[in-house]
UniProtKB/Swiss-Prot annotation:
Keyword Calcium listed: no
PANTHER family referenced in this protein's UniProt entry, alphabetically: INNER MEMBRANE PROTEIN YHJD, UPF0761 MEMBRANE PROTEIN YIHY
Residue stretches spanning the membrane: 49-69, 106-126, 145-165, 188-208, 220-240, 256-276
Sequence similarity: Belongs to the UPF0761 family.
Annotated localization: Cell inner membrane
HAMAP family: UPF0761 (MF_00672)
Database matches in InterPro entries: UPF0761_bac, Virul_fac_BrkB
Keyword entries, A-Z: Cell inner membrane, Cell membrane, Membrane, Transmembrane, Transmembrane helix
Pfam families linked to this entry: Virul_fac_BrkB
The name this protein goes by in its record: UPF0761 membrane protein CJA_2282
Membrane topology listed for this record: Multi-pass membrane protein
GO cellular component: plasma membrane
Length: 427
């Protein structure tokens, strides 16, 4: 028996962490592909192309409401273009400024069109985020209205407050700059754009999905997304400055470059969303007990039935705590939702919506793609000395198993037992 030493313990722990990281990265890549994030980024790119000017126009309109903020519109625009667009996209920023200035002179009908375009942009973003988090339905009614109204109205005003504060801090830096011999203030102001990006991405991951997202996960995801975004920005600017796009496209080079930049930006943002969603579910997925799909489905349906008796629903993480892997639950939930055995609430939780007295085990197995194959005896087996006896025994087993699989789930679960004897709901 090998003795444990600090070196072997460190090596074993390092290998465990490495395997955890490899599994987590594999899950992120698999989820990124399964959620069709590249396709979603393409659709959001075209939507952004149409909605950028309306969003800028709405921002100007909200600034004009408060006299103290009326002069901040151009400053905010320059700030966004400086820290969001690569350094080589001056043409795009100039075009967007001109388009926005012309849009502010539209009639009320044109203004309604701009607001609708901005609304559709936000709706499309929520739809793609809900798809990543596995939420079947987006916000509806008053919740939907309040969210988008807050973004379109309060968002620009909060940006104005932040910009006014930054102006004050800039003045403060000029005032005390001579006393900052260590250059601390200069370092702080150098990373202010990073902090703003971090806050924006974190808020995006927390507020947009129609489900509860842990703030600490959103903070980690927002930080990594900010780092990836800044790296992408630097790499993109370097590639453009060392390429011959202008020679090929001439005066039209700005448009394909802008589309490419927006598409890559959305790919980074959606990748960050996949990362945030995967943190908790990979941790839970480590408890995977490798249940067969039929047994896992029965386990989920049983707990959902017990939850319904209590007037409750079950969240996705509660279901994963039962011992299912993330991949297995995504596969089973798609089939159970498609057969209307379960349903998803507006909050993203799951409820049972099927009469268990009408659903048999064999039907459930067929729906989830695991129809039972009954044992049989082939010709070679019959020629063996014990072949005929085995055929009779296996035939009896076959009949008994067939009768068992024809049981309804209500009979299988014996749902008339006392509620107190039910296993506790996973917490």
């Amino acid at each position: 028996m090998a003795l444990s030493t600090p070196v072997t313990d460190f090596k074993q722990g390092f290998l465990q962490q490495l395997n955890w990281l490899k599994g987590f990265l594999y899950l992120i890549v698999q989820q990124y592909q399964a959620k069709a994030c590249q396709k979603s980024a393409a659709s959001l790119t075209y939507m952004t192309l149409f909605a950028t000017v309306p969003m800028m126009t709405v921002t100007y309109a909200m600034f004009s409401i408060i006299p103290a903020f009326q002069h901040l519109g151009d400053q905010l625009q320059n700030l966004i273009f400086t820290h969001v667009l690569p350094n080589n996209e001056q043409d795009i920023s100039r075009y967007l400024k001109n388009f926005s200035a012309q849009a502010r002179q539209l009639t009320w009908l044109g203004g309604v069109f701009l607001v609708v375009s901005a609304y559709l942009m936000l709706k499309n973003i929520e739809k793609n985020f809900n798809a990543i988090w596995g939420v079947a339905q987006g916000r509806r009614g008053i919740a939907n209205f309040l969210l988008y109204w807050a973004i379109l109205s309060l968002g620009p005003l909060l940006l104005g407050v932040a910009l006014a504060m930054s102006t004050y801090l800039t003045s403060f830096r000029l005032l005390v700059g001579s006393y900052d011999s260590l250059g601390v203030l200069e370092l702080v102001f150098q990373y202010v754009p990073w902090l703003l990006n971090w806050a924006a991405f974190t808020l995006l991951f927390v507020a947009v999905p129609n489900c509860k997202v842990p703030t600490r996960h959103a903070l980690v995801g927002g930080l990594l997304t900010t780092i990836a975004f800044q790296a992408l920005k630097a790499i993109f600017a370097w590639i453009v400055s060392h390429s011959s796009f202008t020679l090929v496209y001439g005066a039209f080079a700005a448009l394909p470059l802008f589309l490419l930049w927006v598409n890559m930006t959305w790919m980074v943002i959606l990748g960050g969303a996949v990362f945030v969603h995967s943190i908790k579910f990979y941790q839970i997925g480590l408890r995977d007990r490798a249940y067969p799909d039929v047994f896992a489905s029965l386990l989920v349906i049983w707990h959902l039935h017990q939850a319904s008796l209590r007037g409750q629903s079950m969240s996705e993480w509660q279901i994963l705590l039962l011992g299912l892997s993330t991949q297995q639950w995504q596969r089973l939930s798609k089939r159970l939702l498609g057969r209307h055995v379960i349903a998803q609430t507006q909050q993203g939780d799951f409820v049972l919506c099927y009469d268990l007295s009408l659903l048999t085990l064999s039907t459930l197995a067929e729906w989830i793609g695991q129809r039972p194959d009954w044992p049989g005896v082939d010709e070679l087996t019959r020629e063996l000395p014990w072949g005929q006896a085995s055929e009779q025994v296996l035939g009896a087993v076959d009949n008994a198993r067939a009768q068992s699989w024809d049981l309804t789930l209500s009979a299988f679960f014996a749902v008339n037992q006392a509620l107190d004897n039910a296993p506790p709901l996973a917490r």
